[in-house]
């Protein structure tokens, strides 16, 4: 599939998952509430999907946004989520292996792409990176954020991983990386192509061969205690 699987497909996936979770609450006559954990890179599309979904449903969808690693940890510790949209495949699989997520519900809902962004207009972010023409470089934490791991792989592929260690600004998730660049606290930053930058600044669409494909899976959480609340 292309950069992002088409919006209609994403909506169908999200709507199906939301409907399934709603029925699992066992209370079709009253307004249900579904807690959804969403990786930071997918928050813009997800908000649009939820807005469309709620036009035809009494279900209230509550989004919790963060890095996939932090959301996974919250779920593992009993956080009351019914759905988890991760930015990778490993964390949903780990929840399935531990019995905390439904194997049959797992689906790849998106394939992410990485960009290098600067708020400078008419700039060449790739040249800025390679030549070192910047002060600070923002990326998400590679230990908890799949897009941070991908950014780290890009630097490794370009032979720059060790060169700019003292210029890195680490965000806990891709949303924080975006804010570092937008606010001017970083000259360059690795962001997701799904994040809405409009016409602000300049970006380099990073070739996919420089990092592993960012396949993103969603799963239903098997937490009966929370689902009955």
Model-inferred region functions:
Residues 4, 20-56, 62-65, 69, ...:
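Exported/periplasmic ABC-transporter solute-binding proteins
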Residues 10-22:
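Bacterial N-terminal signal peptides
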Residues 104:
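Active-site acidic carboxylates
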């Amino acid at each position: 599939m292309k950069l992002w699987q088409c919006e209609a497909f994403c909506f169908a996936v999200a709507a199906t998952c939301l409907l399934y979770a709603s029925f699992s609450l066992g209370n079709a006559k009253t307004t249900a509430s579904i807690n959804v954990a969403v990786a930071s890179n997918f928050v813009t599309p997800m908000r649009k999907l939820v807005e469309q979904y709620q036009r035809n449903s009494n279900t209230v969808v509550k989004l919790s946004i963060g890095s996939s690693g932090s959301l996974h940890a919250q779920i593992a510790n009993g956080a009351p989520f019914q759905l988890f949209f991760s930015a990778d495949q490993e964390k949903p699989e780990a929840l399935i292996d531990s019995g905390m997520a439904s194997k049959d519900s797992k689906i790849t809902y998106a394939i992410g792409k990485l960009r290098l962004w600067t708020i400078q207009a008419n700039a060449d972010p790739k040249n800025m990176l390679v030549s070192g023409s910047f002060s600070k470089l923002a990326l998400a934490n590679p230990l908890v954020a799949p897009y941070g791991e991908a950014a780290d792989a890009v630097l490794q592929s370009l032979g720059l991983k060790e060169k700019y260690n003292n210029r890195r600004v680490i965000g806990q998730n891709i949303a924080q990386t975006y804010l570092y660049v937008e606010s001017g606290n970083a000259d360059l930053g690795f962001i997701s192509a799904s994040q809405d930058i409009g016409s602000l600044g300049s970006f380099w669409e990073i070739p996919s061969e420089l990092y592993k494909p960012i396949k993103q899976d969603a799963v239903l959480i098997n937490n009966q205690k929370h689902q009955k609340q």
